């Protein structure tokens, strides 16, 4: 089954290769949706020739996931620049790069400064001449958007708890810092992300919430019809569902998330 697909990709690659090359538009493989969104924000949507299986760009060939990139497809696409997240092993990413291809691994999830740095690194690798000015404007914009939220220092936790295993965003994560900048007292008492595994103690999440006593739980959802985890429900806590797609892609999309947060807290 894979051979016909590879043949089609080979034909597509030949067609694309026949187009005039542009120094301002390198052929890019983006191995994570948040990287694709960053490239689009930089005006490089047409430079992307391959994306991961999780990307919303249905018009482009799929190049596997961050853990298991598809080396065969990437080779056929013959990119000039391959960008992935830190979840892809560095040696694996470098080994599957065609000769002469630049590889890059970025983060963006380890705080707001890290989010901005990831954008700078992507832009510099892609040859965006004004990337520093762009990121400086974005930094000012998200801070202004956060200031408008007026969180009132409410005790809060930020979780994805509406599908699968819940997890909380703690100190040192981009979401923790964004919500703190929005005037909320984020009371997660852990660093990084804390997972509440389905095979763990059944009362682990309720006990944790009882211990930190949040006034509001921001539950990031992937779709409008998801039902949030029943363990979140408590008499003295407000649950505010938010569109996870606006928050979990570090970069300019968080401006939409901060606007939704402002509207949710100031109806």
Model-derived segments and spans:
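Short, solvent-exposed loop/turn elements at domain surfaces
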Residues: 36-41, 57-59, 164-170, 226-228, ...
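Extracytoplasmic substrate-binding proteins
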Residues: 23-27, 81, 91-167, 188-190, ...
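Bacterial Sec-exported substrate-binding components of ABC uptake systems
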Residues: 2-40, 59-60, 71, 76, ...
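A short, structured surface patch at a secondary-structure boundary
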Residues: 26-87, 91, 184-187, 197-201, ...
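Exported/periplasmic ABC-transporter solute-binding proteins
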Residues: 198, 221-232
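Short helix-loop-beta junction
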Residues: 175-188
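Short, structured coil segments at secondary-structure junctions
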Residues: 44, 98-101, 182, 233-237
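Short secondary-structure boundary segments
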Residues: 32, 86-87, 108, 160-162, ...
């Amino acid at each position: 089954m894979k051979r016909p697909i590879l043949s089609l990709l080979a034909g597509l690659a030949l067609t694309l290769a026949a187009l005039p090359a542009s120094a301002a538009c390198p052929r890019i493989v983006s191995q994570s949706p948040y990287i694709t969104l960053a490239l689009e924000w930089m005006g490089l949507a047409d430079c992307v020739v391959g994306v991961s299986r999780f990307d919303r760009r249905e018009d482009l060939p799929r190049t596997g996931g961050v853990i298991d990139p598809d080396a065969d497809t990437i080779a056929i696409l013959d990119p000039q620049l391959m960008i992935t997240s830190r979840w892809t092993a560095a040696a694996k990413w470098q080994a599957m790069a065609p000769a002469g291809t630049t590889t890059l691994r970025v983060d963006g999830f380890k705080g707001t400064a890290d989010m901005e740095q990831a954008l700078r690194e992507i832009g510099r690798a892609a040859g965006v001449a004004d990337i520093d000015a762009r990121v400086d404007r974005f930094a000012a914009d998200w801070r202004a958007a956060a200031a408008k939220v007026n969180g009132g220092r409410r005790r809060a936790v930020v979780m994805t708890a509406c599908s699968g295993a819940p997890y909380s965003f703690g100190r040192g994560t981009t979401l923790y810092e964004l919500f703190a900048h929005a005037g909320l007292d984020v009371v997660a008492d852990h660093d990084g992300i804390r997972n509440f595994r389905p095979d763990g103690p059944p009362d682990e999440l309720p006990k944790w919430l009882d211990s930190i006593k949040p006034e509001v739980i921001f539950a990031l959802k992937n779709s409008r019809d998801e039902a949030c985890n029943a363990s979140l429900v408590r008499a003295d806590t407000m649950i505010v569902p938010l569109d996870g797609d606006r928050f979990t892609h570090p970069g300019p999309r968080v401006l939409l998330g901060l606007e939704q947060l402002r509207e949710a807290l100031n109806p």
